[in-house]
């Protein structure tokens, strides 16, 4: 979980390369199915062209009930970017934490139950376990990087290749 904590917002580097903030940060959600009113600012979905596609507004949208989140397309953002970057290198529990830590409608509001399979329900505990370390967990005292650097270098070397593909 420590490596996930280090890497989870790495996808926000997209803002440094011209992506607008709205396309990188914020809650994530499934696409191709009805939007939950538990997603932050749900009133703006009416301006999304997907909102007018009838198939997306059916009970399950383009998905089958219980299809599993691994078969669901999520909105694009920093979570999906870092997940794609690290998906071949981390244990599955960490990958769930990375990919779904901003999917609050699921892990905090219990929405989208119809998409889940048993494996997603098992992995939910890991996403919830990680959540307190995501939001509002900043320490006003900066850590001593010289003391921490060897620990993090060893951790990164254990799981990640010398070069990551962004």
Question: Which residues does each PLM region occupy?
Answer:
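Divalent metal-dependent catalytic cores for phosphoryl transfer on phosphate-bearing substrates
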Residues: 1-146
């Amino acid at each position: 979980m420590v490596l996930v904590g280090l890497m989870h917002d790495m996808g926000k580097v997209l803002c440094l390369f011209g992506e607008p903030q709205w396309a990188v940060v914020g809650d994530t959600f499934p696409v191709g199915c009805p939007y939950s009113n538990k997603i932050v600012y749900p009133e703006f979905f009416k301006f999304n062209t997907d909102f007018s596609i009838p198939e997306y507004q059916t009970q399950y949208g383009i998905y089958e009930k219980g299809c599993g989140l691994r078969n669901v397309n999520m909105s694009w953002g920093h979570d999906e970017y870092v997940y794609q970057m690290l998906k071949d290198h981390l244990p599955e529990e960490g990958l769930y934490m990375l990919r779904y830590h901003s999917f609050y409608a699921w892990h905090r509001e219990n929405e989208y139950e119809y998409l889940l399979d048993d494996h997603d329900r098992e992995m939910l505990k890991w996403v919830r376990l990680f959540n307190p370390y995501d939001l509002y967990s900043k320490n006003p005292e900066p850590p001593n990087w010289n003391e921490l650097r060897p620990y993090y270098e060893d951790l990164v070397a254990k799981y990640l290749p010398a070069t990551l593909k962004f």
